[in-house]
């Protein structure tokens, strides 16, 4: 209370242009008057929050969905799973048979996840394709191969305690908000360096004395090579060459520069998280009362929002994609067969350690 009468100056990390971009996207894309959206823009490496909206109209609802609405995150959980896979010997060309599958679990129950529209390849698919089309069978096979506890433990590292280690966790049955989701993704986007997201840079009194100054943690929480290899894999979402039995999830959107992206959907929510070394954006759309999404237009709000932010960043900044470390080897592969193809798609493979 001693500071209350000192005329405090609060310096935030927010960028008015990014804030405006999020507000415009919310206004332009949410056609249904009752559908809600929340979005956040973050600067990788520093973890500064550059923009944040908790709903589409603050005058009608002050509830901050970005930080307080805990919803199932769907397939946006999968990059965390595939980070663990890369840590445990998987590569972009690791394959699993893709067909309708009933899994027998350790407690003698069964689990039968399905793909979108019940579409399957009915053959082996590789990790890159599984990411591009957001394949559920590949995700659950990976999850059970690694052990259900591994993914739960990784999520808990980010301070999310209420995580149930079960088979469906691989498909995003975790309830959290997009602030926490962005916090996890930003660690991958920052080459494994963890800094908690923040909005206040410093606070001074009317004499200019600093009362509070943000301090970075700069903790190397995740493996740098695995994060870089994963970021390269997440570019597959935009690549129409993967659109076979299912569409690559972001193939409808053409961007000038290279970006990583993962989408997610449940019956009641649609999400997208995208990033490059300059910016990360996460967006959610849905109804507050958990009604099913009605129109295909509303289901694309999150995708369009992240694309708007990526395009704005590309127009106003010199965006350069990540570079592989000396431990990673760039290899071009045919997207479907996984064979070497000099005209194929380049992914980063971990070199075998001698």
What are these language model-derived features?
Residues 1-13, 20, 24, 156-157, ...:
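Non-catalytic, structured segments within soluble enzyme domains
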Residues 4, 16, 20, 57, ...:
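Conserved structured core elements
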Residues 7-13, 63-71, 113-118, 126, ...:
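Second-shell loop/turn segments in exported
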Residues 12-32, 40, 52, 59-62, ...:
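A penicillin-recognizing enzyme superfamily signal
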Residues 22, 47, 70-98, 130, ...:
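Active-site SXXK
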Residues 43-50, 158:
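Short, glycine-anchored, charge-dense loop/turn motifs used at functional sites
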Residues 90-151, 166, 194, 206-236:
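Conserved catalytic neighborhood of penicillin-recognizing serine enzymes
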Residues 110-115, 147-185, 192, 199:
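Mid-domain, small-residue-enriched loop/turn segments at the edges of structured enzyme/sensor domains
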């Amino acid at each position: 209370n001693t500071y209350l009468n000192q005329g405090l100056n609060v310096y935030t990390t927010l960028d008015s242009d990014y804030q405006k971009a999020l507000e415009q996207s919310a206004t332009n894309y949410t056609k249904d008057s009752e559908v809600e959206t929340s979005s956040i823009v973050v600067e990788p490496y520093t973890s500064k929050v550059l923009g944040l909206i908790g709903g589409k109209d603050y005058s009608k609802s002050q509830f901050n969905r970005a930080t307080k609405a805990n919803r199932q995150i769907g397939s946006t959980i999968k990059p965390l799973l595939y980070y663990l896979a890369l840590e445990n010997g998987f590569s972009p060309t690791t394959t699993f048979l893709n067909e309708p599958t009933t899994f027998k679990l350790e407690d003698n129950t069964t689990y039968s996840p399905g793909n979108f529209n019940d579409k399957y390849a009915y053959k082996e698919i590789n990790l890159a394709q599984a990411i591009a089309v957001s394949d559920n069978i590949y995700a659950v096979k990976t999850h059970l191969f690694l052990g259900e506890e591994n993914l739960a433990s990784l999520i808990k590292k980010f301070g999310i305690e209420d995580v149930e280690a079960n088979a469906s966790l691989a498909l995003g049955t975790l309830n959290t908000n997009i602030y926490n989701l962005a916090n996890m993704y930003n660690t991958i986007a920052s080459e494994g360096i963890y800094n908690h997201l923040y909005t206040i840079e410093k606070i001074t009194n009317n004499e200019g004395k600093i009362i509070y100054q943000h301090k970075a943690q700069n903790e190397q929480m995740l493996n740098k090579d695995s994060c870089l290899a994963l970021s390269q894999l997440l570019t597959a979402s935009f690549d129409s060459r993967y659109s076979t039995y299912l569409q690559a999830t972001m193939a409808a959107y053409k961007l000038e520069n290279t970006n990583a992206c993962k989408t997610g959907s449940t019956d009641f929510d649609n999400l997208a998280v995208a990033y490059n070394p300059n910016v990360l954006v996460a967006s959610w759309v849905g109804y507050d009362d958990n009604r099913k999404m009605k129109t295909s237009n509303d289901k694309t709000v999150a995708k369009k929002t992240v694309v708007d932010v990526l395009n704005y960043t590309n127009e106003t900044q010199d965006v350069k994609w990540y570079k592989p470390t000396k431990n990673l080897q760039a290899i071009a592969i045919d997207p479907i067969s996984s064979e070497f193809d000099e005209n194929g798609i380049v992914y980063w493979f971990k070199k075998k350690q001698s």
